[in-house]
Design a protein with these regions (language model features):
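N-terminal secretory signal peptides that target proteins for export/translocation
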Residues: 1-9
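Compositionally biased, low-complexity segments
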Residues: 3, 21-24
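Extracellular glycan-interacting surfaces
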Residues: 8-11, 18, 26-274
């Protein structure tokens, strides 16, 4: 899962780090600079590519200070999620766009080149969008509601007002997720119809689920849990307070101020890349 809701400066720091570890190897001749986008809402790793959800549409990072526009559809990408090779998005249409306002949920099976309407056209604007397997959680900015789909967004249930700043979907069991609510973690096994508080050694700011376990940031350290948050182990301390945690099953990235650290062994060791 990647969840980035920080300033433009921090997003650019994340992008620089991803380039440094050579996730991408494209020519910058076909790209636009970061200055062509007013601001970023989302940064997501999709396979071996890095996607940027911006005010001007969806872009792919192609070099340290360059990106290229994906597809011809321009919209303000507020929510972005990837499940396998399918990209899901939500947001607002640009002027002159044929998309509904708000967009609802749209999906692309060819990495953003073309989009199809999935559901909630003109009804939902998801700013938080997280998914795994066939499940998607979305926080609609208009109503303030947390919504849940068990069939890749085709139909939805309204859970209630959203109380969470981040959600990690656990794909091993339908309806299971762990979320950050204030200073607490909560676990659900029925898509937040009910939930229980997980006792943790500290308050977490961001949370990610990979094949190696559940990862979270707190204070100056990265923590890992191998039992769905019941117990935690501090695995990597940093000199300073980490700001961003982004991970897939191959790579994990943590920023500390202007420094970027990358791990290829599930957070056990990190290498400073800039």
């Amino acid at each position: 899962m990647e969840k980035i809701r920080n300033s433009m400066k921090r997003n650019r720091t994340l992008l620089a780090a991803l380039v440094a570890i050579r996730l991408l190897s494209f020519s910058s001749a076909q790209a636009e600079s970061f200055d062509s986008a007013s601001h970023f809402h989302q940064v997501k790793v999709v396979g071996d590519k890095v996607f940027l959800g911006t005010h001007e549409g969806l872009y792919e990072l192609v070099s340290s200070n360059n990106m290229k526009k994906i597809g011809s559809v321009v919209f303000d990408v507020m929510g972005l999620a990837a499940i396998g090779n399918t990209v899901f998005a939500s947001g607002h249409p640009s002027q002159g766009s044929s998309l509904p306002a708000p967009v609802g949920l749209i999906a692309s099976g060819n990495l953003g080149k073309k989009w199809k309407q999935v559901s909630l056209a003109g009804k939902a604007d998801f700013h938080l969008l997280e998914g795994a397997g066939k499940e998607i959680f979305g926080a609609d900015s208009g109503s303030g509601n947390l919504m849940y789909s068990s069939n890749l967004g085709k139909s939805w249930q309204t859970i209630g007002k959203n109380k969470f700043s981040d959600i990690a979907v656990i794909p091993q069991m339908s309806g299971m997720a762990i979320a950050i609510q204030g200073k607490e973690l909560v676990l659900t096994e029925d898509a937040f119809k009910s939930s229980k508080t997980i006792k943790t050694p500290t308050a977490f700011s961001q949370i990610e689920q990979t094949n190696s376990g559940l990862f979270a940031l707190s204070g100056d350290s990265l923590y890992r849990s191998k039992d769905l948050g019941e117990t935690w182990k501090k695995i990597s301390p940093f000199k300073g307070s980490p700001g961003i945690l982004s991970a897939n099953n191959q790579i994990m990235l943590v920023t500390v101020g202007s420094d970027i650290f990358v791990s290829s062994n599930a957070g056990l060791t990190f290498k400073k890349v800039s």
